[in-house]
Amino acid sequence: MSSVNANGGYTKPQKYVPGPGDPELPPQLSEFKDKTSDEILKEMNRMPFFMTKLDETDGAGGENVELEALKALAYEGEPHEIAENFKKQGNELYKAKRFKDARELYSKGLAVECEDKSINESLYANRAACELELKNYRRCIEDCSKALTINPKNVKCYYRTSKAFFQLNKLEEAKSAATFANQRIDPENKSILNMLSVIDRKEQELKAKEEKQQREAQERENKKIMLESAMTLRNITNIKTHSPVELLNEGKIRLEDPMDFESQLIYPALIMYPTQDEFDFVGEVSELTTVQELVDLVLEGPQERFKKEGKENFTPKKVLVFMETKAGGLIKAGKKLTFHDILKKESPDVPLFDNALKIYIVPKVESEGWISKWDKQKALERRSV
């Protein structure tokens, strides 16, 4: 220990060196001799000076006398002195980034209800700073408002109000608070100027984003109008069914040039093999494609399924192609015709189904039997009303 000598001078602290028969620890620490490190830390945490978390017991469930004494001291003095003390303690905790604890002390200071307006202003303003750090933006705004009621020229509160509104995506309110502080209170305040700059950048970003969305929406609308015009020009109708094939989601009817209704129409195509209960899907088929070209595409090539027994008639020369009419019947599609030629005819009226071409490929030898079983009423029932 350090001490003052007989002449009033300072004596340098001496290191404790145990002599023969002396305890290994100095007398001040002898009570910790037989305790583990965890037990020592727990014991020290009950001492206010070393306390890192609140422990209101004496270790055995009793009262922590030292802590209770400190609590009593906190409320000694005049109301403004007590409130000021809470404010100072809160400020220390705020500096240590212990925002929740600091907020609690500021709240205790306000609960004193002292009559010193400047202290109450600081307590509200400082608690607002804690709420801002804790992302409780609406509470921050409320406390700033209370502080500004006391002192309408508190620039920090305008800044915190602006920042809180900004975080809530309320740019108009954020800009209003910062602009008022800049124009009416402190034109040179760097925090306010920076906040105005941040708001301006955000406004520009949102404006650019909105303009882009409007352009894209207008472009989609223009493309939609062009596509509808192209289909009307070609006398094409579309019929929706109750249960569209999911694969149709992978294709979409479109114009080769989206902004030219006279350019080629491109269709997705559903190719049905009704006698086999199978189907194919082709994502894009030009309206200038002939029926024969589409048949060649799906039947020629190394398709093992058409080489199996019972499927030997699925070759381009041994099949017929049928398409469903608007009335629910069938037509035989000439293989030399383009789909443009077929779809534009007023009679028979062959529509698209779910915005896709739909053709039936049937072996010639099985075609009569399949046609005889075609049920017009069931075909109509498959469609949406």
Curated annotation (Swiss-Prot):
It holds the Pfam family Wheel. Residues 1-37 are annotated as: Disordered. GO terms for molecular function: Hsp70 protein binding; Hsp90 protein binding; ribosome binding. It comes from the Eukaryota. Changing C140R: In CNS1-2; disrupts interaction with Hsp90, temperature-sensitive defect impairing Hsp90-dependent function. Transmembrane segments: none annotated. CDD domains: CTWD_TTC4. GO terms for cellular component: cytoplasm; nucleus. Keywords: Chaperone, Cytoplasm, Repeat, TPR repeat. Monomer. Component of Hsp70 and Hsp90 chaperone complexes. Interacts (via TPR repeats) with HSC82 and HSP82 (via C-terminal MEEVD pentapeptide). Interacts with CPR7, SSA1 and SPI1. Present with 672 molecules/cell in log phase SD medium. This is Hsp70/Hsp90 co-chaperone CNS1.
